[in-house]
From Swiss-Prot:
Name of the protein in question: Elongation factor Ts
Keyword Membrane: no
HAMAP family according to UniProt: EF_Ts
Disulphide bridges: none
Organism of derivation: Shewanella denitrificans (strain OS217 / ATCC BAA-1090 / DSM 15013)
Region (Involved in Mg(2+) ion dislocation from EF-Tu): 79-82
Length: 283
């Protein structure tokens, strides 16, 4: 299987490893990026694989409360200039109003606003996309927007200030689950197998490797879960400890960031200039 430059770039972005290391790893796995990451972590070629998705597209994240729920909406455009345009923001807010009023699906939102979207594209000169909408239920909800690009809503049993601070933490720390025990068994088993192999490759005896893995797994599930993370406002305590002190709890959260998973086309300026020079010579 031929390895493409795009695959090499994605692996470099996600691991921070060198180009040839990435190309070799992909060649060994026939282009399987996830397997390549695992193999590179085992060999030490990549120390971590934490970069989740290419954050490249522009746009805005908006939040609005409905009755017993909140709606989070992402609308994309091509540049940060248009992301601040009043016409673009008016369109995005109109879509949000409908979402918050009737909890409709993304497909219904797209269909309802398609004519308006096309007119806006013609007016602004950039592609506009109503990308996704998420809903979170709860009697007690707190929201936080970090600029225009990140939006968080947290549901739980706590005072408004506490939930707001938790929402700010979620924006900054990107947890994937509420509690360590919420991490899916498949993900835990995969990481555990990987950590055992890493420990064995370090030359540790089996019994020591097993103890090391227990500690590493506790760290792993803690780092990707909200209550297991160090609280950004009191780093010596976990979020779980803070909630316990306040006799509070979090049942769910949603975090959206503009452009998650969207790969924006990168312009090769040097190639563009070379092409223009070549075209001029032909003329």
């Amino acid at each position: 299987m031929a390895i493409t430059a795009a695959q090499v770039k994605e692996l470099r972005d996600r691991t921070g490893a060198g180009m040839m290391d990435c190309k070799n790893a992909l060649t060994e796995t026939n282009g399987d990026i996830e397997l390549a990451i695992d193999n590179m972590r085992k060999s030490g070629a990549a120390k971590a694989a934490k970069k989740a998705g290419n954050i490249a597209a522009d746009g805005t994240i908006l939040i609005k409360n409905g009755e017993g729920f909140a709606a989070l909406l992402e609308v994309n455009c091509q540049t940060d200039f248009v992301a601040k345009d009043s016409n673009f923001l008016a369109f995005a807010n109109a879509v949000l109003d409908v979402a918050a009023a009737s909890k409709v699906t993304i497909e219904e939102l797209k269909a309802q606003f398609e004519e308006t979207r096309v007119a806006l594209v013609t007016k602004i000169g950039e592609n506009i996309n109503v990308r996704r909408v998420e809903y979170i239920d709860g009697a007690n909800l707190a929201s936080y927007r970090h600029g225009e690009r990140i939006g968080v809503v947290v549901a739980g049993e706590a005072d408004e200030e506490t939930l707001k601070h938790i929402a700010m933490h979620v924006a900054a720390s990107k947890p994937e689950f509420v509690n360590p025990e919420d991490v899916p068994a498949e993900l835990v088993e995969r990481e555990q197998a990987l950590q055992i192999e890493i420990a064995m490759n370090e030359g540790k005896p089996a019994e020591i490797a097993e103890k090391m893995v227990v500690g590493r797994m506790k760290k792993f599930t803690g780092e990707i879960s909200l209550t297991g993370q160090a609280f950004i406002m009191e780093p010596k305590k976990t979020v779980g400890e803070i909630l316990k002190e306040k006799k509070a709890s979090v049942s769910n959260f949603i975090r959206l960031e503009v452009g998650e998973g969207i790969e924006k086309k990168e312009e090769d300026f040097a190639a563009e200039v070379a092409a223009q020079i070549a075209a001029t010579k032909k003329a």
